[in-house]
């Protein structure tokens, strides 16, 4: 896993499409830089980075496509930014059951193109499809142009895998509807 500690290299990790930050003086920008940026290349490295942040009392700021418009990637306290862009691609595509598993760092357009090449679609076309990652689409509980036909992102999901604050991996199982308690994935869907 690579780590970024140089001040100038860390600046890109606090800029998204939020217009206010573009007017900030340099001193304010520098005051909001993360302590460190982790660039993992596997889920196990994401777990290591999250555990490091947990052990060192650092807030975690995930960095995907930087497509946000409200400055959500700007740290407000000592933080570790985790750049998810190298955790990308399709894990599995089950054409018989119309089920695809993709990593959080895969861009929405890449996922859609992958499916289109095989005669399928997600039917999910948010305005940010070219800028947002799968993880970002889930974290913002994304909706899109064809949501009235295909549903929102949460309607398309059958499961998710999440790294918890202590570095452990949580995987929900796809089970029939249950009345035995809350639907745990909803703790993460729309969590931005």
Predicted regions and their residues:
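N-terminal flexible segment immediately upstream of the FAD-binding catalytic core
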Residues: 1-51, 68-98, 127, 150
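Glycine-rich beta-strand-to-loop/alpha-helix junction loops that act as flexible
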Residues: 63-67
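FAD-binding subdomain of flavoenzyme oxidoreductases
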Residues: 89-93, 98-192
């Amino acid at each position: 896993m690579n780590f970024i500690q140089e001040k100038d290299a860390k600046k890109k990790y606090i800029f998204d499409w939020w217009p206010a930050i573009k007017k900030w003086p340099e001193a304010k920008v520098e005051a909001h830089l993360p302590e460190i940026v982790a660039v993992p290349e596997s889920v196990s490295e994401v777990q290591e980075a999250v555990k490091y942040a947990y052990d060192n009392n650092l807030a975690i700021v995930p960095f995907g496509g930087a497509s946000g418009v409200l400055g959500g990637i700007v740290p407000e306290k000592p933080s570790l930014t985790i750049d998810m862009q190298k955790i990308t691609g399709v894990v599995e595509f089950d054409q018989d059951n119309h089920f695809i598993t993709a990593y959080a760092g895969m861009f929405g357009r890449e996922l859609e193109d992958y499916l289109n090449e095989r005669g399928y679609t997600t039917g999910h076309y948010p305005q940010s499809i070219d800028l947002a990652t799968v993880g970002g689409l889930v974290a913002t509980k994304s909706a899109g142009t064809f949501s009235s036909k295909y549903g929102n992102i949460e309607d398309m999901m059958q499961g998710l895998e999440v790294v918890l604050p202590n570095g452990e991996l949580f995987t929900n199982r796809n089970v029939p509807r249950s009345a035995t308690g809350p639907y745990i994935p909803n703790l993460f869907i729309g969590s931005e």
